Regions:
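PLP-dependent amino-acid enzyme catalytic core
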Residues: 8-245
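Short, Lys/Arg-enriched N-terminal segments with co-localized hydrophobic residues
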Residues: 1-8
Length: 245
């Protein structure tokens, strides 16, 4: 269903001051030590046959990135969990436009897919008998709820959510504050940028990370960015199969 060309897959920091990193380490770190985002050193060539399910397409598209990962054999199971709800492509009235529905997850946000993928991946990468990892999330609404849902009551993880007080809707505030257990939510007197700055400061603090294992579930995390490719690929493949274009 796919073929891969080229050298071994590594991930580089956008700031260029971190050595190329294997995907497992990039997923666990969330943010590169130099404060940059991890991105693939190259984009592999992938030939994909349209799968019957979104989970199958996700597996086929993501496999080259996980070829040398300890998660390789678990990838079908991870995808089955993360993409267990569909992302249907609906035709709209007019000139052939279509709408990709990404609101069928537990928190009605497109971020549910990647948050669930990341939670499954980090759970499997977590060393046995290790202390809990704290997931730090800055949010303006949707991200925090999706991450909270994905990690809620998941062994070995705590979640800290930061959101700007008075700058989310009442429904979003409820979605951020309703969890309890291993999820703690804090209102920040400031903007989303202030929340993001606090999260990045924590993730870049080596002394703090030595004391408390930290990771990110914001879109700065490779584990959030990469899984989002799947539903676009799935929609494009099926559109081409059905419409021939």
């Amino acid at each position: 269903r796919h073929r891969q060309r080229g050298a071994r897959m590594k991930f580089a920091s956008t700031r260029g001051r971190t050595p190329p990193t294997p995907i497992d380490a990039a997923l666990v770190a969330g943010l590169a030590p130099d404060g940059g985002l991890y991105v693939p050193e190259r984009i592999p060539v992938v030939d994909v046959v349209p799968g019957d399910t979104l989970a199958q397409t996700a597996h086929d598209v993501l496999t080259p990135y996980f070829a040398e990962s300890s998660l390789r054999d678990a990838l079908p199971s991870i995808c089955a969990h993360a993409y267990s709800f569909d992302a249907p492509l609906r035709p709209m009235t007019g000139d052939g436009d279509h709408l990709l529905e990404l609101f069928h997850g537990p928190t009605a946000a497109f971020k549910d897919y990647a948050a669930r993928f990341l939670a499954e991946a980090l759970s499997r990468l977590r060393p046995r008998n290790a202390g809990p990892t704290t997931i730090v999330v800055a949010t303006s609404g949707d991200t925090g709820a999706a991450v909270a849902s994905a990690f809620h009551r998941r062994d070995g993880f705590n979640v800290v959510i930061l959101y700007p007080e008075g700058r989310v809707s009442p429904r979003q505030a409820h979605g951020l504050e309703c969890w309890g257990d291993n999820v703690r939510t804090f209102r920040v007197q400031g903007t989303f940028d202030d929340c993001q700055r606090l999260a990045k400061q924590a993730l870049s603090d080596e002394a703090l990370r030595h004391e408390i294992p930290l990771s990110s579930a914001n879109s700065i995390s490779l584990g959030r960015l990469l899984p989002q490719v799947a539903y676009y690929a799935h929609a494009a493949l099926h559109f081409r199969r059905e419409r021939g274009q």
